[in-house]
């Protein structure tokens, strides 16, 4: 069933007593009895007070699973990552064209610019990443998702390469380089998923793995997070 339809049904069921109380209040109010209308307003107030925290909690947990939280991991932890680290919640479990062999990973490029110092790192977010079945033993699916992490690291290193080649510290220019790297990384990630069909096209998956590994090796000297300017 469509997840939006499910949400609509849940709200209708939750608020059905509210609608019934409103009907009774309007009916009584027309007869000159205003007490039911006052009771309805009070009932509505408490209903809203309950549902708003529930919605907020629902939204927070959908974004990040704080009930089973694991802090973001830097790229040096790459080899340790397995589907056990995918702790994100999906209240309405998704699938890929009906196939339960499905997962997604959340990564980011984080930066900090201080006086004459720039720190840039790629992060994998366990509590925002999701796998349909944690006990899946699909090595192909895990490899596909982990290469998303490598791609983020690749564009992090590309940004560090460009920043390292600046003649002097320039905060505005550095921010532009990082923003462009983030945009290029997002575009590359989308193309990767499209070309590999989320790991199902094995030949494309292997092509991307070879390309990404090769580029990462070429940028090995930029794996350290911190860049310092001495001018």
Predicted features by range, described:
Residues 140-153:
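Active-site recognition of the HExxH zinc-binding catalytic motif
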């Amino acid at each position: 069933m469509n997840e939006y339809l499910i949400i609509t049904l849940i709200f209708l069921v939750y608020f059905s007593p509210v609608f019934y109380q409103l009907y009774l209040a309007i009916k009584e109010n027309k007869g000159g009895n205003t007490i039911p209308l006052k009771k309805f307003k009070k009932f509505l107030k408490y209903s809203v007070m309950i549902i708003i925290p529930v919605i907020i909690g629902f939204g927070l947990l959908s974004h990040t699973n704080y009930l089973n939280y694991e802090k973001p991991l830097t790229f040096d932890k790459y080899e340790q990552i397995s589907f056990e680290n995918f702790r994100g919640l999906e209240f309405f479990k998704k699938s890929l064209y009906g196939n339960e062999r499905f997962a997604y990973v959340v990564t980011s490029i984080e930066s900090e610019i201080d006086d004459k110092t720039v720190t840039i790192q790629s992060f994998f977010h366990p509590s925002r990443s999701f796998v349909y079945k944690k006990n899946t033993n699909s090595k192909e699916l895990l490899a596909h998702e982990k290469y998303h992490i490598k791609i983020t690291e690749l564009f992090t290193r590309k940004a560090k390469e460009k920043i390292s080649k600046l003649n002097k510290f320039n905060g505005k220019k550095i921010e532009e380089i990082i923003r462009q790297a983030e945009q290029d990384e997002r575009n590359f990630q989308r193309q990767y998923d499209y070309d590999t069909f989320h790991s199902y096209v094995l030949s494309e998956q292997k092509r991307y793995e070879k390309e990404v590994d090769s580029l990462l090796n070429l940028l090995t000297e930029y794996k350290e997070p911190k860049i310092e300017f001495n001018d």
